[in-house]
UniProtKB/Swiss-Prot annotation:
Component of the RNA polymerase I (Pol I) complex consisting of at least 13 subunits. Residues 312-323 have a biased composition (Polar residues). It comes from the Eukaryota. InterPro entries: RNA_pol_Rpb7-like_N_sf (IPR036898), RNAP_I_Rpa43_N (IPR041901), RPA43_OB (IPR041178), Rpb7-like (IPR045113), Rpb7-like_N (IPR005576). It comes from Danio rerio (Zebrafish). Its main location: nucleus. DNA-dependent RNA polymerase catalyzes the transcription of DNA into RNA using the four ribonucleoside triphosphates as substrates. Component of RNA polymerase I which synthesizes ribosomal RNA precursors. May be involved in recruitment of Pol I to rDNA promoters. One of its GO terms (biological process) is transcription elongation by RNA polymerase I. Residues 288-299, 336-345 have a biased composition (Basic residues). One of its GO terms (cellular component) is RNA polymerase I complex. The gene is polr1f. Residues 1-27, 220-391 are annotated as: Disordered. This is DNA-directed RNA polymerase I subunit RPA43.
Length: 391
């Protein structure tokens, strides 16, 4: 197993990881597909180690490999295929994302076969360039996409990162911030994540100093724009162009003619307005007189009707008063007659009960009448006596 000689007809081993897409184009069964992203070579990755804000680390790592039986005669090719499939994918054992590898060594002379499995198990050791960003670390990327809320960047040509828009900037300011596609951008990492396939997701934000610079730039632009508008307004008001003398004369003539026409028009308008006022005043006075006459007629009619109503009311009141007085008089006379009848009846009874007589025993009507008259009231009227005589 430690023999690295290749048999006749066997493919040559891959020395550059960038050639993986050409050599292992999915011919190996059971192996994962190779990513389409551009993978840097080991030499290029080593050069990037010295770059600022690269977050790349060179580390020698030992790991376990299980080769299928198809790679018994081409062991190195099988190892390279497995390692190439793990590039640019997050690895827990490496605590990062492997970018490139080199210097593969087999630990031990022989491999092992466990039980009835067909895979050959052995350990290898290699040098890996690992991408290990942390929260708070800074990265340099190249802008490849401009959005309303973020900017897409490509770090080391193979890692996607999205830089979010600062809250201090509006969408218009973010659009006019001067960022464009192809420009390098420095940002700070604040979130790292990996999906089920192991693809690393990076979220970043601009540095505070850069945000302050952008805000200051926009404020300065706004101030300059306001000052320029004010200056333009003052120039328009103060620095008016001086016309020529000929134009002035023409303008003066036109002004005098227009003023004369205006005076004539104003005088005609005044005359027409005065005439209209006089006519309107006459019409108003005539209408007022006619209305006053109508009002007088209405007043006279109302006065006559009211006087007639008063007379009628007075007559009715007098009639009712007379009726009431007559009824009262009749009632009083009847009451008096009743009283007189009662008195007469009493007198007649007393005359019948107590007859007067002489010493000789003769009874005369005169004495009884006199006594009756003396005993009666003095209030009797002579009319009553006449009535008795008539009876």
């Amino acid at each position: 197993m430690a023999n690295w000689t290749q048999e006749d007809g066997a493919p040559t081993p891959v020395t550059n990881p960038s050639e993986v897409s050409q050599v292992s184009g999915g011919s190996v069964t059971g192996g994962p597909a190779v990513t389409s992203c551009l993978i840097p070579s080991f030499a290029e990755a080593v050069k990037l180690l010295k770059a600022r804000y690269s977050c790349l680390v060179l580390d020698t790592h030992r790991r376990h490999i299980s080769l299928p039986p198809v790679h018994l005669k081409k062991k190195k090719t099988g190892i390279q295929e497995q390692l190439n499939a793990e590039l640019l994918k997050y690895s827990n054992s490496l605590d990062g994302v492997p970018v490139a590898y080199d210097n593969i060594k087999v630990v031990g002379q022989h491999g092992n076969i466990y039980d009835d499995q067909g895979f050959i198990h052995f350990n290898i050791e290699a040098s890996f360039v690992i991408f290990r960003p942390k929260n708070g670390s800074r990265l340099m990327g190249v802008i490849n996409k401009m959005g309303a809320s973020h900017v897409g960047c490509l770090v080391h040509g193979c890692f996607n990162a999205s830089v979010m828009k600062p809250n201090a900037l509006t969408s218009d300011q973010w659009r006019d911030s001067g960022l464009c596609v192809g420009q390098s951008l420095e940002f700070e990492v604040f979130q790292l994540d990996a999906d089920a396939a192991g693809v690393l997701l990076i979220r970043g934000r601009l540095d505070r100093s850069r945000v302050q610079e952008l805000v200051a730039q926009f404020e300065q632009k706004q101030v300059t724009a306001e000052s320029s508008t004010e200056a333009d307004a003052t120039e328009d008001t103060t620095d008016s162009p001086k016309p020529k003398k000929k134009k002035k004369r023409k303008k003066d003539k036109n002004d005098t003619e227009s003023s004369m026409e205006e005076c004539v028009n104003n005088s005609s308008l005044q005359e027409t307005s005065e005439h209209h006022q006089t006519t309107t005043e006459e019409d108003c006075s005539a209408n007022g007189r006619h209305k006053e006459k109508k009002k007088k007629k209405k007043r006279d009619k109302n006065d006559t009707e009211s006087s007639m109503d008063e007379c009628m009311n007075n007559n009715s009141l007098q009639e009712t008063a007379l009726d009431t007085t007559e009824e009262d008089c009749n009632a009083n006379e009847r009451h008096k007659e009743k009283k007189k009848k009662k008195k007469r009846d009493k007198q007649q009874d007393s005359a019948e009960i107590v007859p007067t007589s002489d010493s000789s025993g003769y009874i005369s009507d005169k004495t009884s009448r006199k006594r009756a008259l003396e005993a009666g009231d003095d209030t009797e009227t002579p009319a009553a006596k006449k009535k008795k005589k008539s009876k």
